[in-house]
From Swiss-Prot:
<dbReference type="Pfam" id="PF01583">
    <property type="entry name" value="APS_kinase"/>
</dbReference>
<keyword id="KW-0597">Phosphoprotein</keyword>
<feature type="binding site">
    <location>
        <begin position="35"/>
        <end position="42"/>
    </location>
    <ligand>
        <name>ATP</name>
    </ligand>
</feature>
<dbReference type="InterPro" id="IPR027417">
    <property type="entry name" value="P-loop_NTPase"/>
</dbReference>
<comment type="similarity">
    <text>Belongs to the APS kinase family.</text>
</comment>
<feature type="active site" description="Phosphoserine intermediate">
    <location>
        <position position="109"/>
    </location>
</feature>
<keyword id="KW-0808">Transferase</keyword>
<comment type="pathway">
    <text>Sulfur metabolism; hydrogen sulfide biosynthesis; sulfite from sulfate: step 2/3.</text>
</comment>
<dbReference type="GO" id="GO:0070814">
    <property type="term" value="P:hydrogen sulfide biosynthetic process"/>
</dbReference>
<dbReference type="GO" id="GO:0000103">
    <property type="term" value="P:sulfate assimilation"/>
</dbReference>
<keyword id="KW-0547">Nucleotide-binding</keyword>
<keyword id="KW-0418">Kinase</keyword>
<dbReference type="GO" id="GO:0004020">
    <property type="term" value="F:adenylylsulfate kinase activity"/>
</dbReference>
<dbReference type="GO" id="GO:0005524">
    <property type="term" value="F:ATP binding"/>
</dbReference>
<protein>
    <recommendedName>
        <fullName>Adenylyl-sulfate kinase</fullName>
        <ecNumber>2.7.1.25</ecNumber>
    </recommendedName>
</protein>
<comment type="function">
    <text>Catalyzes the synthesis of activated sulfate.</text>
</comment>
<keyword id="KW-0067">ATP-binding</keyword>
Length: 201
């Protein structure tokens, strides 16, 4: 479909985003977790979702591996495919924000331009970039899926941090030390959400 096909029109919903947020009791927002493989993105995002669920917050977690089983199963790991992967996830996340959910996304998303693209799509005030900053040496030592070992052996191409660049955020809303305890990181995130009046519980 062409982007500006004149036969395709946008239909407004009778229920507004604000009405949905009022129903949920909190604002809709995306927490975009970014960092190297093994940095702890998925672990921290999952722990935060669990904490938010216990507080009665309506959430959904989009995980990098999971979306490649369906939504992005046709994509590889070239720069072009990575960009399309993030574009699709950004669109899904935006729809969920419009539904009034707190959306957590855990993706390496190595390029600043793609993260900025999603920020602009979702809109300022509804996009929180979470940089899980863990040194490459620590990520490689963890290597939960054995991917660094494969990349070092030349068995895995385009692996971020080894033969594909990772562009660290320059002004993330929150910068987490990935070597800290997960419980500490979750508390920092909850504090941020409360300070920004996204959740009140």
């Amino acid at each position: 479909m062409a982007l500006h096909d004149e036969n395709v029109v946008w239909h407004s919903h009778p229920v507004t985003v604000q009405q949905r947020e009022l129903h949920h009791g909190h604002r809709g927002v995306v927490l975009w977790f970014t960092g190297l493989s093994g940095s702890g993105k998925s672990t921290v995002a999952g722990a935060l979702e669990e904490a938010l669920h216990k507080l009665g917050v309506s959430t959904y977690l989009l995980d990098g591996d999971n979306v490649r089983h369906g939504l992005c199963s046709d994509l590889g790991f070239s720069d072009a495919d990575r960009k399309e992967n993030i574009r699709r996830v950004g669109e899904v996340a935006n729809l969920m924000v419009e539904a009034g959910l707190v959306v957590l996304t855990a993706f390496i998303s190595p390029h600043r331009a793609e993260r900025q693209m999603v920020r602009e799509r979702v809109g300022e005030g509804r996009f929180i970039e979470v940089f899980v900053d863990t040194p490459l040496a620590i990520c490689e030592a963890r290597d939960p899926k054995g991917l660094y070992k494969k990349a070092r052996a030349g068995e895995l191409r385009y692996f971020t941090g080894i033969d594909s660049v990772y562009e660290a955020p320059e002004s993330a809303e929150i910068h987490l030390n990935g070597e800290q305890l997960v419980t500490n990181l979750v508390q920092q995130l909850l504090d941020l959400l409360r300070q920004n009046d996204i959740i009140r519980s």
